[in-house]
Amino acid sequence: MRKWYTPVLLVVLVVFVAFAGWWGVRMATGPLDPASACETTALTSLSTGQVQVRVYNAGTVKGQATTVANQLKGAGFVIHSTSNTDDDYKGTTIVGASGDDPQMQLVASFFPGATVTTDHRQNGLVDVVVTDDLGQGFKADAATSIDVPSGHACLPV
């Protein structure tokens, strides 16, 4: 007589493995950080202390993100986080909401020659992605404030 629980156990195990695979793919392909809201604030100029930056290391040099984050912190920026990324980048890349976003422009002024890309994010954060090729490097004497022609900016809460 055949044992009835063997096929049932096999079906339960297959369902569990399928669910675990689906969940793993969903977690691996999801956003790095859940989008938090930003608050539109009226202002005529934006200073480094009002800008939150995430720094990612896409290169092979260990500690590159921390080094750049410390330079940004020294310039007055608020460092949201540092991390590594496996995404493929060439040179230093600044990622933010839009090209006319004052936060992005201020951060980009510290990295001459960096590539600036937009992803229409709604959280007010700016990402700096560094690789082994820092290009022209970090411009420590860049201006620490920028005029805001629109009169408002979306700052992270």
Describe the function of each predicted region.
Residues 68-70, 109, 142-144:
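Short, glycine/charged-enriched secondary-structure capping and boundary segments
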Residues 16, 27-34:
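Perimembrane helix-loop junctions in membrane proteins
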Residues 42-71:
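Short extracytoplasmic
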Residues 9-22:
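Hydrophobic membrane-insertion alpha-helices, especially the h-region
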Residues 137-157:
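Extracellularly exposed regions in secreted/surface proteins, prominently low-complexity, repeat-rich
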Residues 31-44:
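Juxtamembrane extracytosolic/periplasmic "stalk" immediately C-terminal to the first targeting helix
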Residues 1-11:
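N-terminal export and membrane-targeting signals
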